[in-house]
């Protein structure tokens, strides 16, 4: 193509096809450029492959990059070992390394983030400096910018949240509201299960006992069991769960989501988390059965399995009282028997 490999001096084993492809290359070797302005600025970078107009256009010293699609990895300068497949994928990457983007606009705004994997249109779209994130599904981890070590699988999974870390969202429209969370499914899900019960770490070798006592019956008496319905629409508004038109407004290129969840109105039984929290605080009990909000957009939850501990304590306290009453009753029966013997003896003496 016109002006392809125009500046090459000692670079070898390069292939350039398209106007001004590999235009600035001087000593870079083993590069392949196909498309106008592909690898245009490359000077000493090696083992790069660019396919598509302006793909890897501004790469100068980056190595081992693969870009397939219009403007894919266009802004890369010194980033290494990146793979971009899809128009505008990894478009803004400059120095980020070891990223993989597959899908239109995937990892679009990544600049310095490393070790990210995005699969699906607009996946990890807003990421700039976040590291070690994995997104699979259209618009998954869409809003993340600086968060690290996150995983999102499913269309719109982990859509909101720009700086959360170490969180995992599995399933369509699954919402993450804080760091260090794992969420399975959206709030239309009615059943999550498996063959066996969930296992929680409980190894005495890794526990340090605390002097704090677990309250039993005093805590249980403060709890108020209720029946209720969950207002899913109100929860979605609070969490800002995206609808198709919301995403459409963010980007004219975003596909419209036409899915409308079919919420099942189910009467449920349980407690109000705020009331449980209040009851625990009144007793000075640091109860980890309450999952309190971590920020202004997070919400309350309850870990019902943790209620077993104060319930066991309550049963033990009641059993202790019962045993005490049994002992007292035994003493009373013994005294009564002794009195009956004395009365019988007195009656016998009186008859004589």
PLM region descriptions:
Residues 4, 15-17, 32-34, 49-51, ...:
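Extended alpha-helical scaffolds used as interaction platforms
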Residues 20, 37, 54, 71, ...:
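Intrinsic low-complexity, repeat-rich intrinsically disordered segments enriched
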Residues 222-225, 273-286:
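Glycine-rich, acidic and aromatic/proline-enriched surface loops and short helix-turn segments
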């Amino acid at each position: 193509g016109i002006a392809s490999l125009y500046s090459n001096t000692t670079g070898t084993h390069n292939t350039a096809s398209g106007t001004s492809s590999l235009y600035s290359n001087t000593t870079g070797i083993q590069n392949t450029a196909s498309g106008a302005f592909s690898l245009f600025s490359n000077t000493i970078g090696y083992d790069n492959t660019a396919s598509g107009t302006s793909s890897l256009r501004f790469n100068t010293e980056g190595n081992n990059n693969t870009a397939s699609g219009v403007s894919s990895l266009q802004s890369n300068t010194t980033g290494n070992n990146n793979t971009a497949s899809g128009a505008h994928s990894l478009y803004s990457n400059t120095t980020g390394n070891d990223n993989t983007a597959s899908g239109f606009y995937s990892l679009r705004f990544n600049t310095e983030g490393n070790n990210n994997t995005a699969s699906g249109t607009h996946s990890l779209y807003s990421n700039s400096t976040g590291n070690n994130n994995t997104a699979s599904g259209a618009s998954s981890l869409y809003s993340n910018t600086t968060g690290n070590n996150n995983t999102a699988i499913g269309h719109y999974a982990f859509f909101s949240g720009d700086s959360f870390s170490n969180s995992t969202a599995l399933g369509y429209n699954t919402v993450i509201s804080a760091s260090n969370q794992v969420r399975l499914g959206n709030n239309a899900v009615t059943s999550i299960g498996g063959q066996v019960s969930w296992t929680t770490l409980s190894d005495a070798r890794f526990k340090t006992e605390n002097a704090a006592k677990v309250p039993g019956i005093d805590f249980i008496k403060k709890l108020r069991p209720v029946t209720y319905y969950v207002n899913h629409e109100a929860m979605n508004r609070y969490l800002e769960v995206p609808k198709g038109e919301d995403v459409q407004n963010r980007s004219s290129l975003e596909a419209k989501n036409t899915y409308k969840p079919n919420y099942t109105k189910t009467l449920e039984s349980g407690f109000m988390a705020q009331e449980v929290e209040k009851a625990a605080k009144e007793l000075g009990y640091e109860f980890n059965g309450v999952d309190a909000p971590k920020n202004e957009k997070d919400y309350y939850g309850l870990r019902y399995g943790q209620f077993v501990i104060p319930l066991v304590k309550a049963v033990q306290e009641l059993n202790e009282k019962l045993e005490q009453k049994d002992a007292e009753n035994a003493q009373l029966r013994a005294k009564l028997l002794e009195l009956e013997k004395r009365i019988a003896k007195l009656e016998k003496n009186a008859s004589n």
